[in-house]
Amino acid sequence: MTNAIFQTPVCQLKELNNLFIELTSKNCNQRCKHCYIDFPLNKNVKDFISVDTIKKALTDTKNEKIKCIYLTGAEPMTHPDFNAILRMCLKRSNVCIFTNSTFINEKKVRFLKRVEDESDFEIIFKLSIDHYDEVKNDDIRGRGAYRQVLHAIKSLIKYGFNPILCITNYYNEDTNVLLTKFRDICKKIDFHAKYNNF
């Protein structure tokens, strides 16, 4: 066996049009089987990015044409200052929230819609779901995760949001079958999903 080191090419950006902010790298209320995050044994670890760091990132990129700010993490909505961060980012551009949807309920969605309406920009939701079968999905994400995502989708649609589903084909199933089954579920909850990443 030969050891080798490969260097990836450096690409010069002509402009910065997307800004990714990882609000937390360790705080999540799910323990998905496929997750890359090495969660600490101590569940009290708080590794939230500071609001000042986010302000600095927004200031440092003020001359860039940012089209979207992506709030990621483990679970970004666990950040204690999430609402303030969202408002701050919405002053600058569209905001996309990558979430497992466990913090999304009708009360939260009403609040988020009000925040979006106060802004010139849009909030985009990317919701994680890994299987069309409740038992298989919850085997990956934890009990109740499947129903929570469906509830979140319904609440978001009710208030005019159009969530994007992020699906991991954990069981390596036929993609066409997977998509057909998800389409059937989406129809049942009156969510008209389009597929553009398969």
Provide a role label for each language-model segment.
Residues V10-D52:
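Canonical Radical SAM [4Fe-4S] cluster-binding loop centered on the CxxxCxxC motif
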Residues N3-C11:
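A detector for short, charged/polar N-terminal pre-domain segments
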Residues N42-K56, A74-E118, F125, I129-V135, ...:
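Canonical radical SAM enzyme core domain
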Residues E64-Y70, C96, S119-I129, R147-F198:
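Conserved C-terminal portion of the radical SAM core fold
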Residues K56-E64:
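A short, N-terminal amphipathic alpha-helix
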Residues T61, C89, L112, I153-L156:
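Generic structural signal for hydrophobic
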Residues L19, K108-V115, F182-K187:
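Short, well-ordered amphipathic alpha-helices
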